Amino acid sequence: MGAIRKFPKIVALQSEYCDPLYQARKAGKDDPVSVDVKPTIAEGIAIGKPLRGREILDMMKRHDITVVTAPEDKILAARAAVAREGYYIEHTTAANFAAWDRYCELYGPATDVLITLCGAGIKSDH
């Protein structure tokens, strides 16, 4: 098919309140780091011990996947910003936008960005 000529830059995210993969990448570990999981409004990504964490970290290393955390206080703001554009998303999806914002703070503006909208707002009870 040939639509994509090279492997795209992928940025993974975790909630700042539950970030075992982020902590592992930061420390250069092959296994997820044990973290104290705090309650997060992005409950869909609150996984303290990822079942295939070692495999995920290996994939991140092999494909140079960056991982950033979504600041909890920016998730609600991101959800509101996306709502102003006409999309009703749940908090875990809003974390994608909060993490993208964080990525841009750390690494500069990003162009040609694809952010998935995989959760309708009605899924969340917040």
Predicted regions located by residue number:
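Active-site/ligand-binding loops adjacent to catalytic centers
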Residues: G2-F7, V11-H91
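Phosphate-binding loop/pocket of nucleotide- and phosphate-handling active sites
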Residues: R5, V33-D36, M59, A94-H126
